[in-house]
């Protein structure tokens, strides 16, 4: 029992001493001791010389607590970061042993002490917050360790590769470097290794997700010497949800809307032209709005490829009706119709004259019409209105005569007369078929029917190729 009490007394003694010291420091009667200590530390302190001047380089440890990433701008190629930036180093000139506690001093004391000449290499604009006072902290430890903290908002350059935009990933860095001191005078390191940077996992961005981050320590060589550099690199993955709702879905719906013209009657010119022009102008507006939110870069982005593809489909749908309109209502079909009617009239007149010249006492050789069958004749006449058919040439039946030879038996003569009569009857029937007028086109054209299938199939294939390529 005695031994246990002794052990308890031994272990509790330092705690009691610390409590007494703390109380003595806070005691107004002992405030003079603290004041004397601070005055002694600052008296004769030369801010122009680094710690251990002429000796080994000063080791400066860095800590960053990220408060927020306020903005990532593709137009300016930068991002804005608010952070608590802390640096720690040992300055033996500031060590003390009279007070066994840390001294947190007024931020204005920092102007009287040596601090590292740290700067952000890729910084565009930075400032230290000053509400309600300048956000700086100076804390001294008995062994001379100095902790210097700042609350900083910095806008930092981030060179982005937007070829896969908006399906891209970007690497943005924060480069920390000494401006004047070389590696002979100062060294930088991450204080706490992988735990030197905190707050990254708590950050939420509207268009990005922080996939990963890494800490880098290196030395860079310039003409003036070798300098220490620390790098904090963020890997940002863009969230595609916003762009699907704002760009991709409207483009898809507008492209599908342009196909409605394939189901509108081809003679409804006003409706089809208005629909085509409206969809083309809408796609142009989407393209223009997108360009305003992005920098003027020389290469083609992924979203440019998609919008360009949608624009081509919409524009081709408008050209499809221009083709249909020309085929059905242009001058070409009218000329074909008139030429076909003229040829049919001439053929009918020629056959009528040739039939009247037939003599039953002559040996007549009738060659058949150069029409394969009645169905082919009907299709040829009906096909005059087909835009893909060329001008059909109607050849009259060639009728050849030759002088009668030796007299034949009357039986054969009668048979020949009956055969000639049948031929004449069939010729008249076929000739009458050539007089059929070209009917008015009231059915949907074959081009429209094929377009209803061709456009959706090709657009679906385009989407499959696009998403497989850029997502993977």
From Swiss-Prot:
Disulfide bonds: 158-172
Lipid bilayer topology: Multi-pass membrane protein
Cytoplasmic side: 330-450
Transmembrane spans: 240-260, 271-290, 309-329, 451-471
Catalytic reaction equation(s): chloride(in) = chloride(out)
Gene3D superfamilies: Neurotransmitter-gated ion-channel ligand-binding domain, Neurotransmitter-gated ion-channel transmembrane domain
Extent of the signal sequence: 1-23
PTM description: Glycosylated.
UniProt note on regulation of activity: Allosterically activated by benzodiazepines. Allosterically activated by the anesthetic etomidate. Inhibited by the antagonist bicuculline. Potentiated by histamine.
Subcellular location: Postsynaptic cell membrane; Cell membrane; Cytoplasmic vesicle membrane
Glycosylation sites noted in the Swiss-Prot or TrEMBL record: 30, 102
Residues binding 4-aminobutanoate: 179, 224
In-chain residues carrying the UniProt-annotated modification Phosphotyrosine: 401
SUPFAM superfamilies: Neurotransmitter-gated ion-channel transmembrane pore, Nicotinic receptor ligand binding domain-like
An annotated Gene Ontology molecular function: GABA-A receptor activity
BP terms from Gene Ontology: cellular response to histamine; chloride transmembrane transport; inhibitory synapse assembly
Chain segments carrying region Etomidate binding: 287-308
The family this protein is said to belong to: Belongs to the ligand-gated ion channel (TC 1.A.9) family. Gamma-aminobutyric acid receptor (TC 1.A.9.5) subfamily. GABRB2 sub-subfamily.
Free-text domain note: The extracellular domain contributes to synaptic contact formation.
Quaternary structure and interacting proteins, as annotated: Heteropentamer, formed by a combination of alpha (GABRA1-6), beta (GABRB1-3), gamma (GABRG1-3), delta (GABRD), epsilon (GABRE), rho (GABRR1-3), pi (GABRP) and theta (GABRQ) chains, each subunit exhibiting distinct physiological and pharmacological properties. Interacts with UBQLN1. May interact with KIF21B. Identified in a complex of 720 kDa composed of LHFPL4, NLGN2, GABRA1, GABRB2, GABRG2 and GABRB3.
Protein name per the record: Gamma-aminobutyric acid receptor subunit beta-2
Gene that encodes the chain: GABRB2
């Amino acid at each position: 029992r005695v031994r246990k009490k002794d052990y308890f007394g031994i272990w509790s003694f330092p705690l009691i001493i610390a409590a007494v010291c703390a109380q003595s420091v806070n005691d107004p009667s002992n405030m003079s001791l603290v004041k004397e200590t601070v005055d002694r530390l600052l008296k004769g302190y030369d801010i122009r010389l680094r710690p251990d001047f002429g000796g080994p380089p000063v080791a400066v440890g860095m800590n960053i607590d990220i408060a927020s990433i306020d903005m990532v701008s593709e137009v300016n190629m930068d991002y804005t970061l608010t952070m608590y930036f802390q640096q720690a180093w040992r300055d033996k000139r500031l060590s003390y042993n009279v007070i066994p506690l840390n001294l947190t001093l007024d931020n204005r004391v920092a102007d009287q002490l040596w601090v590292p000449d740290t700067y952000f290499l890729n910084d565009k604009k930075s400032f230290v917050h000053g509400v309600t006072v300048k956000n700086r902290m100076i804390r001294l430890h008995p062994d001379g360790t100095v902790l210097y903290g700042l609350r900083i908002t910095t806008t930092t350059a981030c060179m982005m590769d937007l070829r896969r935009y908006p399906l891209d990933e970007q690497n943005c860095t924060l480069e920390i470097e000494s401006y004047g001191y070389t590696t002979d005078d100062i060294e930088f390191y991450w204080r706490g290794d992988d735990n030197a940077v905190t707050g990254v996992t708590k950050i939420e961005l509207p268009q990005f997700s922080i996939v990963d981050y890494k800490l880098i320590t290196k030395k860079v060589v310039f003409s003036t010497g070798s300098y220490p550099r620390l790098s904090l690199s963020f890997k940002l993955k863009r969230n595609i949800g916003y762009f699907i709702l704002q760009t991709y879905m409207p483009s898809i719906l507008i492209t599908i809307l342009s196909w409605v013209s394939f189901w509108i009657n081809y003679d409804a010119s006003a409706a089809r032209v208005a629909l085509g022009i409206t969809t083309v102008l809408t796609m142009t507006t989407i393209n223009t709005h997108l360009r305003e939110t992005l920098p003027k870069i020389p290469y083609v982005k992924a979203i440019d490829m998609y919008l360009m593809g949608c624009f081509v489909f919409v524009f081709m749908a408008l050209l499809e009706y221009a083709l249909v309109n020309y085929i059905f209502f242009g001058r070409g079909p009218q000329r074909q119709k008139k030429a076909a009617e003229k040829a049919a009239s001439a053929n009918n007149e020629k056959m009528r004259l040739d039939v009247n010249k037939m003599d039953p006492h002559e040996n007549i050789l009738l060659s058949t019409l150069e029409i394969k069958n009645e169905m082919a004749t009907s299709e040829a006449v009906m096909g005059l209105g087909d835009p893909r058919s060329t001008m059909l040439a109607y050849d009259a039946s060639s009728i050849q005569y030759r002088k009668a030879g030796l007299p034949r038996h009357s039986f054969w003569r009668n048979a020949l007369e009956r055969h000639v009569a049948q031929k004449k009857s069939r010729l008249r029937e076929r000739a009458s078929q050539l007089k059929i007028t070209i009917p008015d086109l009231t059915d949907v054209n074959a081009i429209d029917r094929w377009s209803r299938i061709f456009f959706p199939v090709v657009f679906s294939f385009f989407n499959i190729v696009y998403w497989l390529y850029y997502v993977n």
